[in-house]
Amino acid sequence: MSNARQRELIREFLAVTSATSAAAETYLERNHWSLDHALDDFYTQSGGGGRAEQYSAELVATFERYAAGGAMDTEALVRYVGDLGFQLEDVATLCLARLLKVEELTADISRFQFLSTWHGLGCSSLPDMRAAVDALELRLRTDAAYFRALYAYTFGLGLDAGGRRLSVETAIAYWSLFFLDHTYAVTVPAPRLRSWFEFLRAGDHSVSRDTWDMFPRFAQRFPDDTELLEHYNELASWPLVIDEYYEWVKGRNQL
C-alpha cells in the first residue's frame, strides 16, 4: 500500500474519532490498514458503544441490501449500479465510483466508504443517491475542472491489477464515453478522435498515464490535420506515441 493511501486512511480515521494521528496509525497498522476493522478496534478498546457518526437506519439498510461480510464486492456493486438505474459503461457510473473512492473495479466497497459518503451528502435511499449522481453527471457538462478530475481518475480505474498502462481497447472505450457525443465541458473534434483511434488500432500500442493526460490538450491544440501538419513541433514535450501519430498522419497526407 502506498504512503499516500496510508495517509488518506489516517485522515478518514481521524474524521470520525477523537484519536491522535499516532493512535490512528497504530490502530490501522495492527488491523492491516483495514479502516472498518481499525475503527471497530478503536471503539472496542475505548469502551464506546458506537461510532461518532450516527447513520440513519434507512442508509444502513440500503448498504446491507448489497453487503456481505461488511463490504460490497464486485457482484454486489454491479447489482447496486443497476438498481440505481445505470449501466456499468455509463459516465454516471464513473462519477459514482469516484464519489465512493473506488480505486479499482475489482475492489470491495467498505461499510465506512459507503455510509460516510452518502451520510455526508444527506442521502439514504436509492432515489436520493440516483439524484446525487445525476447531478454529478450534469456537472460534467458545464464544469471543466470537474470533468478533468473525473477524466484523470478514470485512468487508474481502468488499469488491470498491477498494471501501469491501459490497453488500447480500454482506452478507446473510455475516450468514446467522454468525447464521442460532444456533450461535456471538454471536447475533442470528432475527426481527430476517429483518426487517433485508427492509428492506435493499427499499431502495437498501449496507453500510458502521460498519453492519457495529454491527449485532450493535444486534440484541442491541433483540431484538424492542416493545423497539425503546419504547426506541430516534434521537439515539444508531447509523449512519444503522439510524435508517432503525427508521423502517421503526415505519411497518410503524402499519399
From Swiss-Prot:
Chain ranges passing through the membrane: none
Which residue range or ranges hold the DCUN1 domain? 54-250
Enumerate the UniProt keywords alphabetically. Answer: Ubl conjugation pathway
GO CC annotation = ubiquitin ligase complex
Keyword Secreted part of the UniProt annotation: no
Domain UBA-like, by residue range, is: 6-43
Please name the GO terms of the biological process aspect recorded for this protein, alphabetically.
protein neddylation
Biological role stated in the UniProt entry: May contribute to neddylation of cullin components of SCF-type E3 ubiquitin ligase complexes. Neddylation of cullins play an essential role in the regulation of SCF-type complexes activity.
Q: What is this protein called?
A: Defective in cullin neddylation protein 1
Q: Which gene encodes it?
A: DCN1
